[in-house]
Amino acid sequence: MTARMDKRFAELKAEGRPALVTYFMGGDPDYDTSLGIMKALPEAGSDIIELGMPFSDPMADGPAIQLAGQRALKGGQTLKKTLQLAADFRKTDDATPIVMMGYYNPIYIYGVEKFLDDALTAGIDGLIVVDLPPEMDDELCIPAIRKGINFIRLATPTTDEKRLPAVLKNTSGFVYYVSMNGITGSALPDPSLVSGAVQRIKQHTELPVCVGFGVKTAEHAKVIGGSADGVVVGTAIVNQVATSLTKDGKATADTVQAVATLVRGLSSGTRSARLVAAE
């Protein structure tokens, strides 16, 4: 699998802290602004970037991310442009892992082999495709692994001991634990339940386990990061973009900086998480 992802988690383990994994929607609200956001994320403390692929029917996403996708699509964002976004980012940053996250339909239309080849060229390290279960691994997961691209699988509170081995079988990079049932942007989960779930997953895999859904503040990141290898934040970032826009959805001079300020705060949470847990 890609060395960039493995190296990043090894570095974080040596530092004794969890990763801050930040999600944003490619092309929201426009290409240039989203590239500015992407470049600002590592500088603000993001360790891994999740690059959202806008899609017209995002069934697992809450209202904030749905609206972000609509803004991106309205602005002309396509899967090809989202790959180009990663390629442009790689011109100045070859260290930060990039995971593309979204749905299978745009990839299928683009063409699986062409997509994987273009993703490799663009410097993509992993994929999260939320509507492809393990039973459909031959569609994209196995071809991605053969190309050397991590395929990151989701585990949920309803993933029981019988189901978990199938979920983990072809997973690489890290495991994304969805901390509650429902859509993105839900309330903060019970930290004790999250800790127990992470430990249960770790009994079956040596992969890092990152926790997402419901993390919005530095304190949330600190609490969840105390028991996980990574904390995923998406809705809070997408909301920060939205609140910085004009009434007609255009970027302002403050858009990129508003996101960077939020991420710096979240980073302070993850950077203190393991230190607190170790006391």
UniProtKB/Swiss-Prot annotation:
Its EC number is 4.2.1.20. It holds the Pfam family Trp_syntA. Tetramer of two alpha and two beta chains. The active site is at 50 (proton acceptor), 61 (proton acceptor). PANTHER family: TRYPTOPHAN SYNTHASE ALPHA CHAIN, CHLOROPLASTIC, TRYPTOPHAN SYNTHASE, ALPHA CHAIN. Keywords: Amino-acid biosynthesis, Aromatic amino acid biosynthesis, Lyase, Tryptophan biosynthesis. The alpha subunit is responsible for the aldol cleavage of indoleglycerol phosphate to indole and glyceraldehyde 3-phosphate. It catalyses: (1S,2R)-1-C-(indol-3-yl)glycerol 3-phosphate + L-serine = D-glyceraldehyde 3-phosphate + L-tryptophan + H2O. GO terms for cellular component: cytosol. CDD domains: Tryptophan_synthase_alpha. It comes from the Bacteria. Belongs to the TrpA family. SUPFAM superfamilies: Ribulose-phoshate binding barrel. InterPro entries: Aldolase_TIM, RibuloseP-bd_barrel, Trp_synthase_alpha_AS, Trp_synthase_suA. It comes from Rhizobium etli (strain CIAT 652). GO terms for molecular function: tryptophan synthase activity. This is Tryptophan synthase alpha chain. Pathway: Amino-acid biosynthesis; L-tryptophan biosynthesis; L-tryptophan from chorismate: step 5/5.
